[in-house]
Structure formats: C-alpha cells, structure tokens
Amino acid sequence: MLPFSMTGLEKDHTRGVLILANAHRRSERSRTASCAGPAVLFGGLITANIVAWAWAFALFADRPVVMATALLAWVFGLRHAVDADHIAAIDNVVRSLMQTGGTPRSAGLYFALGHSSVVVVATMLLALGVVSLGGDGLLKEIGSFIGASVSALFLLVIAAINLAIFASLWRTFRKAREQGIRDAAGLDALLAHRGILVRLLGPMFRLVTKPWHMYPLGFLFGLGFDTATEIGLLSISASEAARGASLADVMVFPALFAAGMALVDTADSTLMVSAYRWAFVDPMRKLWYNLTITGASVAVALFIGGIEALGLIGNRLDLSGGVWTLIDALNESLANVGLAVIALFAIAWLLSIVLYRRLIAGSSGLADTEVLECADATEAV
C-alpha cells in the first residue's frame, strides 16, 4: 500500500504536467526536425558536388585544359539553374504547396533532377555515337519545340490561375479589413467562399501535390535544347568523345552540370519556403503576403511565358525585325531574367513586410509578432 494517496486535484495537476511535458517534447522534436531537414538536404547536395569534383580530379588531374572544361560545365549548371523558366516554375509550385500545409524545400531539387536527366541521357547518346552532332537536327528541333511549348504553356496557365486567385484574395482581404476579421477560423471561412473560378481551377493545382511531382515537369522542361548552357554542355561532351575519351570521362561533365544546377534550384525553393513561413505566422499577414506574392507571380509568369510563346511563334513562322528582334534577344538572355525574378521576389517579400507593418498592423494597433525558430535561420542557406 502506498504511504500516501493522491487527491483528485493532485491527479489532475499531475496529468496536466505530463501533458505539458509531452507537448514540450513533441515541440522539441519538431524543432529538431525543422533544423535537420535543410541541413540534411544541403549536406547531401554538397556531398554530391564534392563527389562529382573528385571524379573529375581523378580523371583529369594531369590535364589542366580538360579540368578548365569541367569547371565550365559546372558553371553552366549554376547558370542554367537561374533561367527564368526554372525560377518561375519552382516559386509558383512552392507557393501552391505551402498553401496546403507542406514544406516543399526539395521542389527545386526534383525539378533540377528531372531537367538534368534529359541532359544526362542526351550526353550518353552522344558519347555512345548513337546520335552525332551532324545528324541530330531533327531530334534537336523536335526537342526544342516540345520543351519551349511545355515551358510557355505551363507558365501561362500558372499566370491565369494566379490572376484568378489574386482577384479573389483582394476581395477577401478587403472584406477582412472592413469586418475586422483577424482570427484564423474567420479568414479560413472567407477563403472557403472565394467564388466559382477558384473552385474550378483547384484541380489544376492538385496536379502537383508533392515536391517529387516536379521531376516529370522538369524532365519536360529539359526537352528543349535551345539554351546556350545546354548546347554548350553537349558540345563539350561531344568534343571529348570525338577525341577518343571513354564514356566515364565524358559523363563527368553532365554530372558536374547536374550537381551545380541542383544546388542552386534547391536553394531557391528553400529560400522561398522561408519567405512563405514568415507570412504564415499570423492569419492576416498570411493573406496580405499571399496577395503581394501572387501579384508578383502573375507578372512574372505572364512576362516569361509570353516571351517564350512569342519566341516559339516567331521561330515557327520565321518572323524577324522590329519587335521580333527584341523577343529573340529576351529569349537568349533568360538566365539574366531569372536573376531579375529572384530579385523581384526578394523585393516583394521586403515590401510586404514594410507595408504590412506600416499600413496593416500599425493601423490596427497590433504588434507584428515574430516567431524566431532555428529552422528560419537554417533555411536561409
């Protein structure tokens, strides 16, 4: 028999302490997982880059000219990752998946893997002599048409969906401010009645419901060998094969290309997750940030998708001069446009913070509380 007996009040107190302790342990495990996720992801990517470079050094340590060519292939991957179609597709899908409660840090990785799979296969075919540089005109033309069509169509569809969502979010935002609604339940109720367009277009967003669904999309995007980086990589690989290099020697170039591209595209999706997480701390802030970024997404997707679509039309119909010269120039410098898109989203995030604090939180007398987690610091790699 126990030397004492617990009263009902003591039992309730003990049960409450145990519940709080369990909740604290779950919170700590969640925090640890949030910190470990990006570290594991980027640790693996950095390891992949190191392995690719170790492979290159093992093959070409005594051939500095070829090592310089290997460096060029890796830089091609870094540069190709910031092509405008990559950035626009990844950022839009990350925003969509964050809406459903996901943390799609790896969306950029899967997109890059799908994209680089095409390059790896094409390089292998070249190295094996199945396709020669002089006889791949038809294959290149078909691949270019498919890749450009998929890229332009996807971005224009995304622009149309985001435009409908932007109009709906704006109506919801105005209604929330007019009615003074700031609680999550109230905003969710408003968001559930955003009109027929959002309900009709919802299934299109559900086509990409997990980060790995970006792999086939990246593969389709990669079918167009019409960018300078991809053509340059294939030329490097073909030149080495023509000099009598083995398959292992040639395949190191697409490996370096893929490693560099995956690193940058994954960094892009991870940074976007961090940006969206800031917005999701407060329901009203979430709505405001969605409004800001959706507007930027519409502008970016329309601009890039329009450039690609018009470029495709111009090439098919042999149009030249005037505005078509400008369109050709823009299509040839999409990597620079991609860097501008990253800058645009960063500026939109900063403006969203400043305007929210001055116009929204300030006018309502509510402090813009911040939630500082180690995940936020880790994700901003």
UniProtKB/Swiss-Prot annotation:
Membrane topology, as annotated: Multi-pass membrane protein
Organism: Bradyrhizobium diazoefficiens (strain JCM 10833 / BCRC 13528 / IAM 13628 / NBRC 14792 / USDA 110)
Tagged with keyword Lipoprotein: no
Protein name: Hydrogenase nickel incorporation protein HupN
Regions of this protein lying in the Periplasmic compartment: 61-63, 132-149, 237-243, 314-333
InterPro entries the record matches: Ni/Co_transpt, Ni/Co_transpt_high_affinity
GO biological process: one example: nickel cation import across plasma membrane
GO cellular component: plasma membrane
Cellular compartment(s): Cell inner membrane
Keywords: Cell inner membrane, Cell membrane, Membrane, Nickel, Transmembrane, Transmembrane helix, Transport
Source lineage: Bacteria, Pseudomonadati, Pseudomonadota, Alphaproteobacteria, Hyphomicrobiales
